């Protein structure tokens, strides 16, 4: 889920995330830059001596729990725990709830790509962790990141009243067509974009949806075939 770092932090300032929350979640489709945003925030704002970044699919968790990790990290002076891809850890919401209640000095921040599973599990975290939903690039953000054309934010009323101006663009429609075709993902300029996009689709159809709906893998593949019709 690592996207190009160029300008991504500035692009997603619109999220207005309260990074000081005791616990928070950052969810969104695969490939929109959640991991990059985490790593940028750690690099720019955190002290490496009391900060730990882990991925929930790490082999460490085959024999250890999140609570075990938190306990060991806390005893070594840890204060900030970043957990990537939390949905890959079984019963993650229950353990996060326990960590929230048992370790008041430990800040926990997590990401998740399986939005359905994340919202299914947030019942255990109600009133404990704000969940921020991170989408792909808007047309305005796409122009800023890939064409260095900076357009201010307009309200719907301003757009409907034709008070919108896009400086530096004489003919915006070709750029908009380009955005519609491949502008949603920050990695759209990669040479391997089509391969990466297919991987995102396959992971969603063959893993995320079947896992959420308790379907087997073959059913997930059939669902993908139906969508291709």
Feature annotation, model-predicted:
Residues 1-12:
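Single conserved hydrophobic/aromatic residue that forms the stacking wall/gate
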Residues 26:
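Hydrophobic anchor at the beta1->P-loop junction of P-loop NTPases
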Residues 30-31:
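Walker A (P-loop) phosphate-binding loop of P-loop NTPases
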Residues 34-35:
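Conserved lysine of the Walker
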Residues 49-77:
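Short glycine-rich substrate-engagement loop in P-loop NTPases that contacts/grips substrate
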Residues 107-113:
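Structural recognition of the conserved hydrophobic beta-strand(s) that form the central parallel beta-sheet
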Residues 116-130, 146-147:
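Short regulatory helix/loop adjacent to the ATP-binding pocket of P-loop NTPases
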Residues 144-229:
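Interdomain hinge/linker elements that couple catalytic modules in large macromolecular machines
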């Amino acid at each position: 889920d690592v996207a190009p770092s160029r300008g991504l932090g500035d692009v997603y300032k619109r999220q207005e995330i309260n990074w000081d929350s005791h616990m928070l979640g950052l969810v969104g489709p695969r490939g929109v830059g959640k991991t990059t945003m985490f790593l940028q925030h750690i690099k720019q704002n955190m002290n490496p001596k009391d900060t730990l970044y882990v991925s929930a699919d790490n082999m460490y968790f085959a024999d250890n729990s999140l609570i075990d990790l938190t306990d060991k990290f806390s005893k070594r002076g840890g204060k900030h725990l970043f957990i990537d891809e939390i949905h890959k850890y079984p019963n993650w919401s229950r353990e996060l709830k326990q960590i929230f209640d048992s370790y008041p000095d430990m800040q926990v921040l997590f990401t998740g790509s399986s939005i359905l599973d994340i919202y299914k599990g947030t019942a255990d975290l109600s009133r404990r962790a704000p969940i921020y939903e991170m989408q792909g690039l808007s047309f305005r953000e796409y122009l800023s990141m890939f064409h260095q054309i900076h357009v201010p934010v307009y309200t719907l009323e301003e757009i409907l009243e034709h008070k919108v101006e896009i400086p530096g663009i004489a003919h915006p429609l070709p750029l908009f067509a380009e955005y519609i075709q491949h502008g949603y993902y920050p990695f759209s300029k990669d040479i391997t974009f089509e391969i990466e996009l297919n991987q995102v689709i396959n992971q969603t159809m063959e893993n995320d949806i079947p896992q959420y709906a308790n379907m087997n893998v073959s059913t997930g593949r059939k669902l993908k075939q139906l969508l291709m019709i």
